[in-house]
Every structure is written in structure tokens, then in C-alpha cells.
């Protein structure tokens, strides 16, 4: 098996080996998802190879499965291919999450040369420093890029990586995602969420609040089909990213799928941090009748807050009428 890390700030994952297809109204994009810098994927078929389905790939396109179970196709120029032992070493290092759009600089000072511009959600490997270096570089973190170069990022831009990417080693046809992740963590699928919540938040209420706050960080971001970054994000990209950054990996698209942590609960039992499902759309419930979502509606065109309550000025009747499920990881 081969592996790779996304080596560009925002990589594109296509649902087909080509970038466009014929739709009812003409040519449309085949974009399904995005991979952010430093995130891992399993390479099912190398560029130019033949897939298990018998499809010959273009010479510059690889078939991949992301560490959270999304299958697609990526141009090789957006990937840094690595050996299994290299990826294990990377995942076992001190990884940090880019908590906001930020620059990687050549020096621990604002005058440093800009090496890369990263979006929130990207992953970097923190490099160890001596006590003297840390004091001299106070306020900055020394980081390792996927190509081996070192640079510096402001400490205030970084957060701990709370999720696990190790399912990339065990994912295979016929194995549920929860079981694949549990296999590499030496636990069971039913313990994945409780263990992550206990480790990072100490309890359900704190986790729910954190998921809501992560989603709010994308307020005002434009709607982008298949997007998952501050450059543009779609409905399921918003909800799955909020959960991911809080340590729980849910299904990427706007539906509840068996084998991932989320399951349906009664509407009257909904709590902040639960997901609201509509046909082809998903939102995150914030409490008191309000929810946050990324909507392609012309009046919004991005991440906004709306309401389920008719007397709220943020009420959207069209969505309330077609709400069909509430999803929870608890």
C-alpha cells in the first residue's frame, strides 16, 4: 500500500478521474472534497495505474482514500508520496493544527520570507528546539513542511491536532470506517467518541460547545461546492470540519451512513452540536432554535446562522419544511 500527504494549502479531491462531466445544464465540476495541507491519504492506485474497477487513470492522477474515509481522485502535483514507515513517524510526531489562515515564514520574525500560505485546518509538524532557541523565538513555533523544509509560524495560530489519521493504514473494502480507525488505536468502535471526548474535553457538554464554536469560526466564508477551507466551504464540509477539529471523524457528506459515529435521534432530543439533515443539505444545531450552515442560497451564499423558529427574524421556512433527521454522536 502507498500513502501521501497533501502538500498544497488546499488540494482538490474529485469524485471521478476527470475534472468535469456532462450535467443536465451542461458541463459541471466533479469536485467532491478537499484535502488540507499535511493531511494523510491512502493511495489505492498510483498515477497512470489501473483501478480495481478496471479504469486506467490519467498519468498525473492518483486514486486515494482520505484518512476519514472519503474516496476520490487527486492530481499528483498536490501530493507528497511517502512510505508507510515515514507516515507512521509523521503521525507520531508533535502535530499542530493551523487554527487560522497563516503564513509559514523562513525566520521567526515578520520580515521572514513567506514560504507558504496555509488555511485553517492544515497540519504542521512542530520541530523541537532548545530552551535557548525557544526563548529567542518566543511567540513562534518551528515547523517542518512536507517537503522537509523548516519554517516558523506564530504560536497563536496553532492548536493541537485532536483527531487521529491512523485509519489510513487499515481502511479496506468491506470494513466500516469506525472499525478501521478502532483497529489502529487498539480499541473498539463504540469507544471512539467517548475516548476522544474524555481526552480533549472531559465531558459531552464541553465537546458540544466546542463543535459549535469551531463552526462559527467559518462565519462569512463563501459557499463552495466540495469546499472545506476558509477559501470556501460547503454544508457538509462545515459540519464535518467542526467535528474533525474537535477530535471526532464523521461522514463527509450530508447524510447519516452506518459505520461512522453519527446516528439518528428524535427531533425533540436535539442538543447543541447535533446535525440537522435536509435533502442534500446539513446544518449544525446551536441551541435555542438556531443553527449554522453553509448555504448556496442566493441571499446568503456562504456560512450564516438561521432559525427553526417562525418568530425569529432568521427563520427559513423552506428548510424547516424539509428537515428529515437529527444526527448525534452521543
Task: Label every model-predicted segment.
Residues 1-13, 18-29, 37-51, 56-96, ...:
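Boundary regions of SH3-family modules and the immediately adjacent low-complexity/disordered segments
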Residues 38, 50, 118-127, 191, ...:
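Loop/turn positions that initiate beta-strands
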Residues 91-130:
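Asp-box/WD-like beta-propeller blade repeats and closely related beta-sheet repeat scaffolds
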Residues 215, 227-246:
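Active-site nucleophilic cysteine motif
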Residues 248-311:
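...with weaker cross-activation on analogous glycine-rich loops/strands in unrelated enzymes
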Amino acid at each position: 500500500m502507498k500513502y501521501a500527504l497533501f502538500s498544497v494549502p488546499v488540494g482538490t479531491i474529485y469524485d471521478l478521474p476527470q475534472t468535469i462531466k456532462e450535467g443536465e445544464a451542461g458541463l459541471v465540476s466533479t469536485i467532491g472534497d478537499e484535502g488540507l495541507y499535511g493531511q494523510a491519504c491512502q493511495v489505492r492506485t498510483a498515477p497512470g495505474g489501473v483501478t480495481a474497477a478496471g479504469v486506467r487513470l490519467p498519468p498525473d492522477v492518483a486514486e486515494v482514500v482520505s484518512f476519514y474515509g472519503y474516496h476520490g481522485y487527486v492530481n499528483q502535483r498536490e501530493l507528497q508520496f511517502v512510505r508507510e514507515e515515514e507516515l507512521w513517524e509523521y503521525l507520531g510526531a508533535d502535530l499542530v493544527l493551523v487554527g487560522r489562515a497563516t503564513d509559514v515564514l523562513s525566520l521567526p520574525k515578520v520580515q521572514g520570507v513567506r514560504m507558504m500560505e496555509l488555511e485553517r485546518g492544515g497540519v504542521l509538524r512542530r520541530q523541537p528546539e532548545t530552551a535557548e532557541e525557544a526563548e529567542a523565538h518566543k511567540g513562534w513555533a518551528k515547523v517542518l513542511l512536507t517537503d522537509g523544509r523548516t519554517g516558523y509560524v506564530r504560536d497563536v495560530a496553532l492548536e493541537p491536532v485532536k483527531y487521529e489519521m491512523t485509519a489510513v493504514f487499515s481502511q479496506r473494502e468491506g470494513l466500516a470506517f469506525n472499525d478501521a480507525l478502532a483497529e489502529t488505536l487498539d480499541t473498539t468502535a463504540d469507544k471512539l467518541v467517548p475516548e476522544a471526548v474524555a481526552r480533549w474535553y472531559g465531558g459531552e457538554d464541553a465537546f458540544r460547545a466546542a463543535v459549535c464554536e469551531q463552526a462559527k469560526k467559518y462565519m462569512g466564508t463563501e459557499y463552495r461546492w466540495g469546499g472545506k477551507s476558509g477559501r470556501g466551504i460547503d454544508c457538509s464540509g462545515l459540519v464535518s470540519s467542526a467535528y474533525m477539529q474537535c477530535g471526532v471523524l464523521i461522514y463527509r457528506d450530508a447524510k447519516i451512513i452506518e459505520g461512522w459515529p453519527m446516528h439518528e435521534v428524535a427531533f425533540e432530543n436535539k442538543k447543541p452540536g447535533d446535525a440537522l439533515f435536509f435533502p442534500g443539505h446539513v446544518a449544525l444545531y446551536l441551541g435555542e432554535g438556531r443553527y449554522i450552515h453553509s448555504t448556496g442560497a442566493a441571499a446568503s451564499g456562504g456560512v450564516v446562522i438561521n432559525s427553526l423558529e417562525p418568530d425569529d427574524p432568521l427563520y427559513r421556512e423552506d428548510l424547516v419544511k424539509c428537515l428529515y433527521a437529527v444526527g448525534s454522536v452521543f
